[in-house]
Amino acid sequence: MSMPKEPRQLMINLMYLVLTAMLALNVSSEILNAFKTINQSITSSNNSIVDKNNKLYQGFDEQENMDGQRDRVKPYNDKAKQVKAEAEAVIKYLEDWKEKVIAGSGGRLENREIKNESDIDASTRLLVEKKGGEELKGKLLAFRNMLLNTVKPEVKGQFEKDLPVKIIEPEKSDNNPQADWSVAYFHNMPTMAVVTLLSKFQNDVRNSEAIVVQQLANEAGDIQVKFDAFQAIAVPKTSYALAGQKVEAQIMLAAYNKAVNPSVTSSGG
């Protein structure tokens, strides 16, 4: 499991790892409730990432529609749209698996809560015995490879290290002598824990989508902007002046594009 740099994401990952380790000792209602809390946090995080990504996609469309920019921006925008489509497909695929496991464990109550959160048969049957986990693993790998093939070759090596969506093969153990990935993640795992893991995979997909689309946006940022307006600007050398006092100022002519409304931030004190 990859570890993100953001504090909130790091905390979610660490909590998931701790809870998974505790499952090996005891499947208690307290641990299952903790998984439920982590799942809610991951879902909230996923929604925030979607909002961020949508702003990037909107920015691509706006930039492509600017005068004289279409031919230069469109290749980046097309790549971004492909990333979005592939990400949405994987997100839906993982969501479908959640519902399959929940249905296999007994379904939901009227309030939409999972009926049998501690059931360990559904995940084992569907994702291990019926090889659903192998298919899921293949989907994640295919998405990862698509993202790596989207970025420029000179940054691909760094992205191979940084992309959150990745497959980490387990080591051999007494319970998993073949080091089978599906067994490591899904064998005898409670339904609530599996649902949380699938949400974690969705989080990895969303974060990886954001990283690659941001890279495309950075590359598109090198595009030349056509200036269509000019304005005289006076920049005084002092922030205040007394009545009758002479003021020195730097006079310049600024060129800009009326269609561009940049956002400027500062990290200074």
Q: Where are the regions that the model predicts?
A:
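Conserved mid-sequence domains
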Residues: 161-269
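C-terminal, active-site-flanking charged/polar segments
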Residues: 19, 23-26, 44-48
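Juxtamembrane extramembrane loops of integral membrane proteins
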Residues: 35-202, 209-212
